[in-house]
């Protein structure tokens, strides 16, 4: 018996994290990208999508976060290159915690005449909740108007998540789900049937 799973990927950028929304003519030259993951799950399968000059479908469509930042296989060590690198990784418990990556397109800038929109999925097909922030770098032929900065509360990083927090959340989830023996990781000792 053969089973197939059909996954419909996003190609229009809807729901993705927006790291650049530029109007005018110029060249995109880089990004610093910060991820705070509340889970040890690998966050890096989010595809990057760059829409040039008002495209509805991205002409630059990547294959995953780590690929966009010139790495592969879920990097867990710090490394630095002039044009890309992982400046911070939390190697204590999977990918729980904060990561900082960067990429500069100095030798291969992305040119645009009217606009550039850069997005990246948070997890494969936006399946993860992540605290993401970024800084985009570009040169522009004329000064543009930037949107107002978000309120301070929206720009403040979320509290650092520790292993204990995950256990507490899991305990609450199990309690709310009935603490049954069918739940994954059954650490509750149920009384045997008498």
Q: What residue ranges belong to the model's regions?
A:
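Extended, compositionally biased non-globular segments
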Residues: 47-142
């Amino acid at each position: 018996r053969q089973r197939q799973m059909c996954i419909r990927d996003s190609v229009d950028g809807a729901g993705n994290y927006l790291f650049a929304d530029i109007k005018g003519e110029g060249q995109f030259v880089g990004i610093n990208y910060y991820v705070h993951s509340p889970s040890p799950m690998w966050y890096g399968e989010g595809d990057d999508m760059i829409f040039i000059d008002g495209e509805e479908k991205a002409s630059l469509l990547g294959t995953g976060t780590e690929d966009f930042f010139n790495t592969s296989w879920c990097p867990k060590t710090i490394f630095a290159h002039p044009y890309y690198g992982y400046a911070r990784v939390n190697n204590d418990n999977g990918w729980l915690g904060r990561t900082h990556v960067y990429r500069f397109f100095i030798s291969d800038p992305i040119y645009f005449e009217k606009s550039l929109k850069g997005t990246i999925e948070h997890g494969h097909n936006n399946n993860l909740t992540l605290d993401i922030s970024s800084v985009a770098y570009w040169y522009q032929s004329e000064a543009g108007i930037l949107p107002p900065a978000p309120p301070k509360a929206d720009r403040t990083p979320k509290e650092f998540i520790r292993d204990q927090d995950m256990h507490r959340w899991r305990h609450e989830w199990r309690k709310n789900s009935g603490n049954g023996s069918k739940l994954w990781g059954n650490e509750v000792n149920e009384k045997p049937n008498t």
